[in-house]
């Protein structure tokens, strides 16, 4: 068919040229001459003055059509559309290699095709049995990597299209826009996910105006009004009468809001008293929901403002309360005011003891304080301070998770870890550890830190106070 198409055309002159290109096919096979004839402008160019050698070369080209044939005329014809709309894409070894392909993210099912080998009649003529499959027939993770399960080398044949075959790595291209964007950020050697400040990272006008106008909004008289309003709010912290404990209840003096200041010695009780009357307080926390909600908020604020001795006493209060609940076989509710404040208590203790624990734990080869609170392993417990932090971290994790109750296994198998705990051990054991490490450690700075942890009196550190507003 190709020779008959050539014979129907007139020979071309010497200025005509036939060039091969590696672009997409515009016209192939027997349609080449017909498409060229429709786009002909200068018909005088087809005067039969061509030599026999030129006609023979034209017959060879048409008989063995290249990938693309472009015929140049004195006036360029209009580019014809391909006659075969289902033309196959060339194999991996031909054409442009770094062409960007659309990446399908959410339509994975559309890319899942049969892994069977194509039928012989469906295989294109240019794609042999040992050539690479088309890119569009493979998912991205197979085009950019090697598949396991095949002992053949990377240079062996890849005729099979099964998931057990191994594929070569595809050279990944870089987006031009991304490269320019990274160069503008001054970080062209890293990906776009590298943190960096963009050009729009600036303070907006409203925020700058609000900061500048604070001196006109806040005055000394305004500060006095703030404190006066806060005192009025604290005079009636709870509505609906609070916990409304009976006068005969041993917890009545401590359940009032704002009655008097807290005095540890005035509220000292024994372990036997806590076991005997602790259930009554447990039920009041459960029944008086409005008062318990206010108690949770106030206790959380109190836990964050305590000094070291008060914080250690609060740790003993929390662990003693949990031990009483385990002894009475009651659920440890996370909305209990004492248990829910374990998060604030842990944060305050870490803030107060972090400078001391840094040297104390490193000298004994124990994990850091952050690792103790994150991993919460009982195997890391070696002394009273580590026991206190691990147990409080386990309770705080249950509270922060949103669970209704703390599992008994959080306190060891069936809560048996607290069986050896004696109320008051957190305060006594931590003070003992600080003093023992102070005597043992030879570092001068550690001695200062240990002493200041025990007696936090101001010696040095603050240098000025600058306030131009009031």
From Swiss-Prot:
It is found in: Host cytoplasm; Host nucleus. Residues 73-85 have a biased composition (Polar residues). One of its GO terms (biological process) is regulation of DNA-templated transcription. Its main location: host cell. It holds the Pfam family Herpes_UL69. InterPro entries: ICP27-like (IPR008648). Binds viral intronless RNAs and SR proteins through the Arg-rich region. This is mRNA export factor ICP27 homolog. It comes from Equine herpesvirus 1 (strain Kentucky A) (EHV-1). The lineage of its organism: Viruses, Duplodnaviria, Heunggongvirae, Peploviricota, Herviviricetes.
């Amino acid at each position: 068919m190709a020779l008959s198409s050539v014979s129907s055309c007139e020979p071309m002159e010497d200025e005509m040229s036939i060039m091969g290109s590696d672009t997409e096919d515009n016209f192939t096979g027997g349609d080449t001459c017909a498409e060229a004839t429709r786009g002909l402008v200068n018909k005088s160019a087809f005067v039969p003055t061509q030599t026999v050698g030129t006609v023979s070369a034209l017959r060879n080209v048409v008989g063995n059509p290249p990938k693309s044939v472009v015929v140049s005329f004195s006036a360029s014809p209009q580019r014809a559309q391909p006659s075969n709309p289902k033309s196959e894409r060339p194999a991996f070894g031909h054409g442009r290699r770094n062409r960007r392909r659309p990446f399908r993210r959410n339509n994975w099912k559309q890319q899942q095709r049969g892994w069977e080998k194509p039928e012989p009649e469906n295989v294109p003529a240019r794609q042999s049995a040992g050539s690479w499959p088309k890119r569009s027939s493979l998912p991205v993770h197979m085009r950019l990597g090697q598949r396991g399960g095949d002992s053949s080398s990377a240079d062996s044949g890849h005729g099979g299209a099964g998931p057990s075959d191994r594929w070569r790595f595809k050279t990944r291209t870089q987006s031009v826009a991304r490269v320019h964007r990274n160069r503008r950020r001054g970080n062209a050697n890293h990906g776009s996910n590298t943190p960096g400040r963009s050009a729009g990272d600036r303070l907006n006008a409203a925020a700058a105006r609000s900061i500048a106008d604070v001196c006109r909004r806040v005055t000394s008289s305004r500060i006095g009004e703030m404190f006066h309003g806060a005192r009025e709010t604290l005079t009636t912290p709870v509505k609906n009468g609070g916990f409304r404990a009976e006068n005969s209840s041993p917890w009545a003096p401590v359940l009032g809001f704002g009655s008097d200041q807290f005095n540890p010695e005035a509220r000292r009780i024994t372990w036997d008293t806590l076991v005997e009357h602790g259930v009554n307080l447990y039920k009041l926390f459960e029944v008086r929901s409005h008062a318990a909600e206010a108690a949770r908020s106030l206790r959380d604020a109190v836990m964050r403002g305590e000094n070291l001795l008060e914080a250690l006493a609060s740790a003993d209060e929390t662990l003693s309360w949990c031990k009483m609940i385990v002894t009475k076989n009651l659920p440890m509710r996370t909305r209990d005011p004492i248990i829910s404040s374990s998060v604030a208590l842990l944060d305050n203790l870490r803030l107060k003891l972090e400078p001391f624990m840094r040297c104390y734990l490193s000298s004994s080869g124990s994990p850091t304080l952050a690792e103790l609170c994150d991993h919460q392993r009982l195997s890391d417990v070696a002394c009273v301070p580590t026991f206190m932090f691990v147990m409080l971290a386990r309770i705080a994790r249950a509270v922060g998770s949103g669970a209704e109750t703390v599992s008994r296994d959080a306190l060891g198998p069936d809560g048996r870890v607290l069986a050896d705990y004696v109320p008051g051990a957190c305060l006594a054991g931590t003070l003992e550890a600080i003093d023992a490490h102070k005597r043992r450690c030879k570092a001068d700075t550690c001695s200062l830190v240990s002493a200041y942890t025990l007696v936090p009196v101001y010696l040095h550190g603050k240098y000025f106070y600058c306030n131009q507003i009031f």
